[in-house]
């Protein structure tokens, strides 16, 4: 997978009630082998406040972003957990630890969905699809992967307030890139369609 660097002003859209914008920062997103089995000590607890600690920065609340309309449409689309190609995976992961759930959903979505760039197929229009649409069509771009993972994790008990959709700047491809951030204990972890490895945020 290509190494990503956060944008100078990346945007984090929490799956809960607030939208957040992360402040300026530097450095690369580290790739951690077996990160979930051997997490690094947190510099600060993500539960010390409502704002998540992501990429070494703490998010601050903002009222609105230019992505609100796309986010509302995609995040409110229904996903029936017991009906669809995802049903067996969810059944197997249900009742497991959050770590197992996160890994199962990340691996399944990455293997099930084929990356398709909206801007190449829709004459420049970037559309955010609901999870069921993405998973049934088996096509989507990075934000579609992230939204699908969020909805699947929600279906097996991961709270919305512990998940964040984050937009970063991929300096290698020179394009925006969407990731799902999930809280596990006091750590924040990155789910990326570019890799099955869980990355330390």
PLM feature spans:
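A structural boundary/capping signal
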Residues: 1-201
């Amino acid at each position: 997978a290509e190494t990503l660097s956060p944008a100078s002003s990346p945007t984090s859209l929490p799956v809960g009630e607030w939208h957040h914008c992360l402040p300026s920062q530097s450095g690369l997103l580290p790739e951690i082998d077996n990160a979930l089995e051997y997490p690094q000590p947190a510099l600060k607890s993500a539960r010390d406040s409502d704002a998540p600690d992501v990429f070494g920065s703490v998010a601050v609340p903002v009222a609105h972003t230019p992505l609100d309309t796309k986010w509302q449409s995609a995040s409110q689309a229904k996903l029936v957990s017991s009906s669809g190609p995802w049903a067996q995976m969810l059944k197997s992961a249900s009742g497991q630890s959050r770590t197992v759930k996160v890994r199962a959903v990340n691996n399944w979505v990455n293997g099930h969905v084929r990356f398709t760039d909206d801007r190449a197929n829709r004459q420049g229009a970037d559309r955010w699809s609901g999870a069921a649409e993405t998973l049934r069509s088996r096509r989507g771009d990075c934000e579609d992967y992230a939204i699908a993972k969020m909805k699947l994790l929600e279906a097996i008990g991961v709270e919305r307030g512990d998940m964040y959709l984050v937009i970063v700047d991929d300096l290698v491809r020179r394009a925006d890139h969407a990731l799902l951030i999930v809280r596990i204990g006091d750590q924040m972890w990155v789910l990326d369609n570019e890799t099955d490895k869980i990355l330390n945020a």
